[in-house]
Amino acid sequence: MKVKVLCRNPDDYVRETTRDIQRVPRNYDPTLHPFEVPREYTRALNATKLERVFAKPFVASLDGHRDVISCITKHAKSLSTVISGACDGEVKVWNLPKRECTRTVQAHEGFVRGICSRFCGTSFFTVGDDKTIKQWNMEAPGYGVREEPINTILGKAVFTGIDHHQREGTFVTCGQTVDIWDEQRSSPVLSFSWGVDSFSSVRYNPVEPDLLASCASDRSIVLYDTRESAPLRKVIMQLRSNTLCWNPMEAYYFTCANEDYNLYTYDIRNLDVPVTVHMDHVSAVLDVDYSPTGREFVSASFDKTIRIFPKDKGHSREVYHTKRMQHVICVKWSADSKFIMSGSDEMNIRLWKANASEKLGVLSTREKTAANYNKKLIQKFQHHPQVRRIARHRHLPRDVLKQKRELKEMKEARRRKEQNVRKHSKPGSVPLLTEKEKHVVKVVE
């Protein structure tokens, strides 16, 4: 007699320990799940709501400065170290995990205009209103030993910015001219000038370190190649740019922070038109810094807010503000791309999360899986009206909201005026300019 017996492998359904979750057999045939999309939509909506509920971006405030913070820089090798300079000439070294100041140096008389770390992380450079460049050891001196700079260079004019080469012992400063310096020499190796009174900012390209760019007082952005004896080209804009930052992943893109409340991303291969115009601030943009991934950047503005922009989008995905925070002077993105540091008028350095709702600390495997699943669901249903409305909603200070409405009315009035002028003029006499073309005056080779 033949008997048919069901035979199952216990490994397919039995838990290894009592703490494991129960194994549930699933059939992924879509015909068996007709309500799969409505269920996913509900989950996406709930995930979006929870994301806004848990959006607590503020992490810590580092206080200790006695004057306005003028500049911040990151340590080249250490994630936990940040160096800041103030308007009273004081430089402080901070330990971020402990949230405390580990060292204080009276570096300059007057403003500290710029700080940069050496590429190996053994020392850092500062420039100030006292016309000096000073190199300081990254390690604090022993107990009772007086704090002295490793090297001091006396310049002929005030320096307004400094940046270090990514691989070699050279650095660049800006003031009345853009100067390339060797660490072993007390005079510049190379100087660039192009009929400009002064420069406000200069940055090396992190990918192509022979390229650098500067912002000038005549509303221009000038590009240089250290292998050449003269500047390459410059683009003149409607208003002055305060500072700029290169994309760390794509060598030919840089973003500049402008006085006209916007940021502009340029491709150095075609400077006639910016690649993207980033609009959301309601006052002058003072600083900008890219994420190490090169996909986003953060901007600091005179309107007392910080905004995070995707590199290819015209509007910000996030805005940070507090009641106590005043005009934001400088901003930096941490090297692990998880945190943002900002320095403002009321003498505080604030630490923010790059993703406002991200949970800090070690996550379990199930937490990671759930977070990734929710992220994909939100991405899948991001254009649905309810999901989009909740994801975009932000609370703004009353002043910022009022200025935003005023700017919107002004832009609409300007657009109507241009339409009326074009309507009552000879066809073709009034050119139709796009938003990107309006802000560039000319490119000089």
Curated annotation (Swiss-Prot):
Location within or outside the cell: Nucleus, Nucleolus
Q: Which biological process terms from the Gene Ontology are attached to this UniProt entry? A: maturation of SSU-rRNA from tricistronic rRNA transcript (SSU-rRNA, 5.8S rRNA, LSU-rRNA); oocyte growth; protein ubiquitination; rRNA processing
Q: Which spans does this entry mark as compositional bias, Basic residues?
A: 413-426
Question: Which pathway, metabolic or otherwise, does it act in?
Answer: Protein modification; protein ubiquitination
| PROSITE patterns per record | WD_REPEATS_1, WD_REPEATS_2, WD_REPEATS_REGION
Gene Ontology CC terms, in alphabetical order: Cul4-RING E3 ubiquitin ligase complex; nucleolus; small-subunit processome
Tell me yes or no: is NAD among this UniProt entry's keywords: no
Region Disordered: what ranges? 411-434
Q: Pfam families per the record? A: Sof1, WD40
Which keywords annotate this record? Answer: Nucleus, Repeat, Ribonucleoprotein, Ribosome biogenesis, rRNA processing, Ubl conjugation pathway, WD repeat
Do you know which PANTHER family this protein is assigned to? DDB1- AND CUL4-ASSOCIATED FACTOR 13, U3 SMALL NUCLEOLAR RNA U3 SNORNA ASSOCIATED PROTEIN
Function according to Swiss-Prot or TrEMBL: Part of the small subunit (SSU) processome, first precursor of the small eukaryotic ribosomal subunit. During the assembly of the SSU processome in the nucleolus, many ribosome biogenesis factors, an RNA chaperone and ribosomal proteins associate with the nascent pre-rRNA and work in concert to generate RNA folding, modifications, rearrangements and cleavage as well as targeted degradation of pre-ribosomal RNA by the RNA exosome.
Subunit and partners: Part of the small subunit (SSU) processome, composed of more than 70 proteins and the RNA chaperone small nucleolar RNA (snoRNA) U3. Component of the DCX(DCAF13) E3 ubiquitin ligase complex, at least composed of CUL4 (CUL4A or CUL4B), DDB1, DCAF13 and RBX1.
- The molecule here is called DDB1- and CUL4-associated factor 13
Protein's gene: dcaf13
